[in-house]
Amino acid sequence: GKIASVANCYECYGIIYNKAILEKYCSNYSGAVIKSVDDIKDLDTLEKVATDINEHVDDINKACDLHLTEAFASAGLDSGSNWRFTGHLAGLALYYEFKDAGCDLTAGQKEVTGKYMDNFKRVWDMYTNTSAADKATLDSGSLNAESELGMEEAVFYQNGDWEYANFADDNENGYTVKQSDLSMISRRPSGLRKTMS
């Protein structure tokens, strides 16, 4: 076969989440829609959890002694952040479409059918509908999703494993989150899969 690429560095991306907050949500909040973090196995369940957290954030804060402002960290569309969605989120939908079509990546794909674009839109809508950020300001450059997760204001944050160093326990960034409290859910077109614990 033809060599399409040579692996130089392995990175993974998906949804970083604060498992300590989710565990408090499951054990201390009587209205929790899941009993355990392990119940999040598909997009339907993640949507239910994110929607519930966002809609009942004040009650959850009281029950769990938290200071959340949202379920998902802001989905900034400024040039410093939009690659998370224009590249990573869209790229996943295209990858699985090309894979299903048996695409020879060295030759290219002649047609994009958008087979998984409904799920792309569904995930994007979940990000923006369960965030405290005003949708009209997503391209303003004034949002800081990393800080929202780091200060434990958000539970979920789409990014990759390279972000882990920014949440170092040395408190250099002033964040309150502990590295040991973070985990990741990878995204698939048909659902979700936890990759780290």
Give residue spans per PLM region:
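Extracytoplasmic/periplasmic solute-binding protein
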Residues: 2-9, 13, 44-108, 154
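Paired acidic/hydrophobic, glycine-rich loop segments that form the ligand-binding mouth/hinge
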Residues: 155-159, 181
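Extracytoplasmic/periplasmic substrate-recognition and gating elements
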Residues: 171-197
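Short beta-strand and adjacent tight-turn residues that come in two discontinuous sequence segments
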Residues: 74, 140, 158-160
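Glycine-centered hinge/linker elements that transmit conformational signals in sensory
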Residues: 47-52, 96-140, 181-183, 190-191
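Aromatic-glycine-rich donor-binding/catalytic loop that engages nucleotide-sugar donors
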Residues: 20-38, 132-133
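A structural signal for short loop-to-beta-strand junctions that line the ligand-binding cleft
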Residues: 1-22, 193-197
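Short helix-initiation/N-cap motifs at beta->coil->alpha
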Residues: 40-45, 136-151, 162
